[in-house]
Regions:
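Conserved nucleotide- and phosphate/pyrophosphate-binding catalytic cores
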Residues: 16-18, 126, 132-305
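Short, Lys/Arg-enriched, disordered terminal segments
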Residues: 1-2, 305
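Conserved aromatic-histidine-acidic binding/catalytic patches
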Residues: 49, 119-122, 206, 237
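A conserved hydrophobic position in a structured secondary element of the catalytic/binding core
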Residues: 40, 113, 185
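N-terminal Rossmann-like or analogous alpha/beta NTP/dinucleotide-binding catalytic cores
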Residues: 2-108, 252, 257, 261, ...
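Classical nucleotidyltransferase
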Residues: 63-65, 78-84, 91-166
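Short helix-capping/linker segments at secondary-structure and domain boundaries
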Residues: 73-77, 112-119, 224-233
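Short, histidine-centered active-site or binding-site loop motifs used for metal coordination
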Residues: 8-10, 41-43, 116-117, 174, ...
Length: 305
């Protein structure tokens, strides 16, 4: 069975975009792949966090250092996340080294488990491609060690956009919260956000990301949550106004969120989540230690007895 790996940062509240683009697909992927999903808590330290346990699998950080020695400053400075942060800096602000070196740790997160595929949004594809480059560079220098992972970009739903500004991605860091649906928020509030989502003035429902980004984004959300294709939705809503379309979509979103709330409340009882995390950490730690030991033998830093 092929192996798939993905991680989620534990910062901010989970959005509908996170759910559609990453969490929901994990459920279907686990039937087809050996899934490894981790909480990227070391990545969260690029912004201040309350002190707590650093990580269950510290081997990520160790491998991140080794791989960081094989990546150039030019490669790191070309990463979209760094460029985006740099472009938004105010005069008295600076970027921490953690943001600049972020891709090195991401390379380690990926390569330490030898995945065949890494599901990513279009905006994260660059990071997976860098991981492939570094893996190939390491393999050429020290002999075959890492698999070259393939980025898996979903055709639909990989990038859910802001409801108030559909030219930018729905983000946990949305300052107003008006364009972002948080999956554990009050369901009626989320429905109202769908009803007030920005569209356009021609009141025609069809998919055209360039000219109709708002309605195209809503069609994507509707399609993913209902299981109905975008083409089928467009045909069904021919001659129907945006108001009815949004009302129907709000019900679909509300029903999906209700299922999430029910499941969340069910598994949030007792020690169920801690048990799953601990069992997963034990398995991941074994795999990571094995790979790290192999890397250290290759680069010659193991202590000879």
């Amino acid at each position: 069975m092929k192996r798939m790996l993905s991680g989620i940062k534990p910062t901010g509240r989970v959005t509908l975009g996170n759910y559609i683009g990453a969490i929901k697909p994990f459920v279907s992927y686990q039937d087809e792949y050996e899934m490894i999903v981790f909480v990227a808590n070391l990545h969260s330290m690029t912004i201040y966090q309350e002190p707590k346990d650093l990580s269950d699998v510290l081997e990520h950080a160790q491998l991140g250092w080794y791989l960081g020695c094989m990546v150039s400053m030019g490669e790191l400075s070309r990463m979209t996340q760094y460029k985006d942060k740099a472009s938004k800096l105010k005069k008295d602000e600076s970027i921490g080294a953690g943001i600049f070196n972020y891709p090195s740790l991401m390379n380690a997160d990926i390569l330490i488990y030898d995945p065949d595929y890494v599901p990513v949004g279009e905006d994260q594809k660059q990071h997976c491609e860098l991981a492939r480059d570094i893996a190939e560079r390491f393999n050429n220098r020290y002999s075959e060690t890492f698999k070259l992972p393939e980025p898996l970009v979903p055709k639909v739903g990989g990038r859910i956009m802001d409801l108030q500004n559909p030219t930018k991605k729905m983000s946990k860091s949305d300052e107003t919260g008006k364009g972002c649906i948080y999956i554990l928020d009050d369901i009626n509030v989320s429905k109202k956000k769908i009803m007030s989502a920005v569209t356009d003035s021609d009141n025609a429902i069809y998919y055209d990301v360039k000219n109709k980004p708002g309605i195209s984004n809503l069609l994507t959300i509707y399609s993913i949550l209902s299981g109905e294709s975008i083409d089928a939705l467009v045909e069904r809503y021919q001659g129907v106004g945006y108001g009815q379309f949004k009302k129907d979509l709000a019900e679909v979103v509300g029903n999906e969120l209700q299922k999430i709330h029910d499941k969340y409340n069910e598994i949030n009882q007792g020690n169920y989540i801690d048990t799953i995390l601990n069992e997963g950490a034990d398995k991941a730690r074994y795999m990571a230690r094995k790979k790290l030991a192999k890397v250290e033998r290759k680069i010659g830093i193991t202590i000879k007895k």
